Amino acid sequence: MKITIGHLYPDLLNLYGDRGNIQCLMRRCQWRGIEAETIPFELDDKIDFSKLDIVLLGGGSDREQMIVCEKLQKIQPDFKAYVEDNGVVIAICGGYQLLGKYYKTDQGNMKGLDLVDLYTEQGEGRLIQNIVLQSELFDMPIVGFENHGGRTCINNNKPLGKVLYGAGNDGKSGYEGVVYKNVIGTYLHGPLLPKNPQLADWLIQHALERKLSLIH
């Protein structure tokens, strides 16, 4: 059984070392004898979500996010169907913001992909610091570095974790990230997965479980 990881637009969404997250997933599969491959998608490439087991959506500048969002809007129904069918997604920083309904900035509103019921609005100043979370998903805390101007509201969705140290989604709710089905969105960098191998293993496990369920 092979795990196929789709890395969406690494040439544009490459602000925070997301290739380190890909390398972590590949290595942890290798250590367990799980065959894995990564497919990097450029802007003009066709994406067939039915052939992907894990999707990584990284972070970029507002300009690059807008370029990517306009492209993904054209295949939003396919991406939405993948998410609703328990497809595994890890979305970081700008990618996290793209999951939602919109991102409101001083320059105007950027329509999101509406994959998860959340939205982001630009706040005053940036939230920049180390951050520690306690998550119901893991015994070990989740650690990383946050650097974002957006304030994200996840409505009634489940957060990735409770903030023990740092700001989190909006600097006031006390929570960070979102978990919806097999989608995780977060502002944490580090890179995220090498710092939190338990999270990498969660993604791999859920990808394998989904693949097995589709076979049967």
Task: Specify the residue positions occupied by each region the protein language model found.
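N-terminal beta1-alpha1 cap of cysteine-dependent amidohydrolase-like domains
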Residues: 1-84, 194-215
